[in-house]
Amino acid sequence: VLDKSWPRGAVWRKWDIHVHSPASDGFRGDYNQFVIQLGNADCDVIGINDYFSVAGYREVVRRLADPAGDTEGNAAYRDALEKLRSKVLLPVVECRMTNVLMNKHGKSGQRLNFHLIFDPELPAEDIENFLKTQQVDGSSIGGRYADSAFLLNSVQVDFNEIVKRLKADGNFRDRFLVWLPYDEYGGIDGIDPKTDQLLKLNLIRDADMLGSSNKNQADFFLWKHPTYTEQQFREWFGVRKPCVKGSDSHNVNDELGRLKDHKSLPTDKYCWIKADPTFAGLRQILHEPEDRIFIGACPPKLEEVRNNATRLIDRLQITRSGDADTPDKWFACDIPLNADMVAIIGNKGSGKSALADILALAGNTHCDPDHFSFLVKNRFCERSGKLAKQFEVRAFWADGTETTLRLNAKPDPNGVERVRYIPQTYLEKVCTETEPGQQSEFQAELRKVIFSHISEADRLGKHTLDELIEYKTEELKGQIANARREISRVNTDLVRLEDKFTPDYRARIEALLAEKQQELKAHKDIAPIKVEQPSEVGAEQKAAFDAIALKLGEERATLNRIDSETIDKRELQKSLAEKIALAGKIEGKIDTFGSEYARLGRETSDDLQRLGLELGKLVTVTIDKSMLVAARKKLTEDKTAIDGVLDGGAPDSLPSQKAACLERITALQGQLDAPNKRFQEYNEALRAWNEKAALIEGSPEKGDTLKGYEAQLAYLRTGLPADIDKLRLQRREIAKEIHKSIAAIRDVYKAMFAAVQELISSSVVIKEGFKLTFESSIIVRNLAGELFDKYISANVGGSFYRKEKGTALDEIGGEFDVNTAEEALSYINKIVSHLEHDMRTAQQSPMSIASQLRKNVDVKALYDFLWGLGYLEPEYSLKLDGKDLSHLSPGERGTLLLVFYLLVDKSHKPIIVDQPEENLDSQTVYKLLIPVIKDVKKRRQIIMVTHSPNIAVVCDAEQIVHAHIDRAAGNAVIYTMGAIESPAINRYLVDVLEGTRPAFDNREAKYFAS
């Protein structure tokens, strides 16, 4: 159903409402020429404007209505008359005021003009009769109405009086508009504000619109001036006033539509109005004075349409397919679509969402069809789509291409998506997710829009934001992993040293030292009783004893040498074993390094090839293990030789030599007499006693000896703290590198979101209306949760005893900003300090960290967790009015998502939204969503199914599509379309969105005026 002849709704048209006719005094040309001028005019609406007269308008209308006119005049005239029938004519009366004012430039006697624009539905005779009653020098115009010179030069009227009379006359009330020239001939700009400011303001306040083509002047009347407040403008003008302009043509040779400058020379400007070409359409600019008027060469939206014809649906046809056999009518419609905003309205079950689904299908949406509400299995596509298959949609795009599909078809996910579709069920699902975290659909949708703002070149061939971020952070994550392995190695050494720094360990060493001291004391108590060498012996006995003693001395020296050599060999054996193991470890590391280099070659091969480079010319790695292998071989050979020397089974080994030596000593001792034997036994016992005493005393290098324990205690007092500090410093520096890499990942996020951030920063609608901000930061993610779930038990004594994990770290972490490495590491140190000391007491008693750990958890694991910084995450978060996305209500999420789809999304493809207001309150729609929609429709086709008057009417939808289903007529779905100002559409709006006029009036009567 087409409402009159403008089903596409409000579109941009050229209007010239200041065109004089031969009825104006001084006009150059006759009516035949005038009709030719009108018919060939480059404009759609023409206001025939004469001084205190509509005679010219009436004559042209007569000619259009006269059938005989089709045969009159020449061919040019007849052709122009036919063209003129497609245009709209408005009756306009130009009046002069009685007021004579002092010009602000010092000129006196200035006359002020104003225009009365009448509804063409009014009979011209009624307008003429009203004009003839105007008084001139005490008598009405009457019979002098045909005297154009008299009307031009002699008639002046009181502005307030004539407006008052028209408003009081039921025939004219709401059927005329007052147009007041401003900065043009007869305009009020010349009024001196020093003497007649009040008059000037009153004239402006009483005018419906002003005459000016100056953008600065137009902006002023739209209250767009930084010097003045909205309150000041409201006091001056009452409401915002539209500015329009006409050609002020007085000559049939003028080009109508084209505006003139102050020297009456033609310019490249036209007066464009986006409305039905009717009086009601003109009235609409009073309610939308900014968005429905453009004075210039061409409105930006028309340029947008020309440049993006592939991204606009021009028309949609839904018809029965050729093989259809269903008796039901369902669809038989042809819907021209507006390029701006289309609002689809209708009662429940009327076919609103059906049209949205069909549009989405025709545009190959990539939205999951399961979210459709009409083209689904349990509705129109039931029984394997048998019914849907009998109907087809044909979409005509503005570039001339067409898309035809059966309604049982499914969108092709591999094809080009030509429309963005947001069904009601999908929007509701995304907005009501219970855990809208980083992996939620809500976040995923936002990331898609953000990715659209990254230039094709900067996407590096990646298809999603996550892919691009992963690519750009891969090496940084590798650096973090390597650093964490290094941290773990340092922690292994550090925990070993810290275990020695405890009071328990010191006490254990002190106890071992005391035990050795007692052992040495006890050993001294059992020293051999001294036996003197026999002195009263004969010369022969003495000679025999001396010979045996000499041999015994030699054997004992041999025994001492064997013992000393055995000790040396065992030390060397131990050293060689350690060196062999070290060589093997180094060889393993070299092999690992070689494997890493090989992996680097594999991973960079394709990239280097694209750059025309070779890895070998950038990095040269030469691995030669020959010296290491030779060294390990020599060490192994030496150890094998020493193993043989120390092996008791070999005849020439040291143990075998010692056994033989002891046998010889025993044999020599058997040759001595009793006194000398006792003396030798004493010497042997004394040697063994001294040997054991030396073993007990030991040396600082021997750990389990008296001097070894003394050295360990000395190390605990002096050397150990320095070694611990050294490892802690080393660990801190590595942790700083980890933090540096995390910060670098954060900066990658920042670069990814820079384009969106710039858009948000530059958008007044987003910045002020939504208070939408991006924040780049490093955040602590679930530190307390992991710390107390995996590592620390709050059920034992200590600083965290009986504390809830959610609050346990609050008093510690609040003072630290983890965005800096120093403060992040200070935070960790404070946590460790709370584990090392019981902060619940004034004494802050020392505590063992190990005693506070969960079962099967060691201190090293805790250190790896704390110093690995795995709980620090780079985040580039979006916040709405200071709130993180995870804390937004479903309504706030819906608003934000729609803002992203509408305003932030760079795509110019049509966007179809099914009932976005379902999760939004009316105030949110009015304050936040409407400014966004009005801004976006300037550059993108928006199609919305809605039952909200705020969206359809306050957003000033250019086209309203009313859906209705006639069940009695075979389920015929009927779509009626047109502009808001269309009378039929206006009635639908009131009935459907407001619940009928009486319901609306009832509500309005009960509201208090603010």
Where are the predicted features?
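Extended, charged alpha-helical "arm/stalk" segments used for dimerization and assembly
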Residues: 407-495
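Conserved ABC ATPase signature
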Residues: 336-340, 344-353, 423, 876-900, ...
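Charged catalytic cores and adjacent phosphate/nucleic-acid-binding surfaces used
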Residues: 1-45, 54-91, 95-124, 185-349, ...
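C-terminal lobe/lid and adjacent interdomain/linker elements of RecA-like ASCE P-loop ATPase modules
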Residues: 386-388, 405-406, 414-417, 926-1010
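Extended, charged coiled-coil "arm/hinge" scaffolds of SMC/Rad50-like chromosome-maintenance ATPases
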Residues: 489-492, 496, 518-887, 893, ...
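Loop/turn-to-beta-strand initiation segments
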Residues: 875, 907-910, 938-943
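Flexible phosphate/Mg2+-sensing switch loops adjacent to catalytic phosphate-binding sites
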Residues: 75, 363-408, 742-759, 764, ...
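Phosphate-binding glycine-rich loops of NTP-binding sites
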Residues: 46-49, 58, 118-121, 341-375, ...
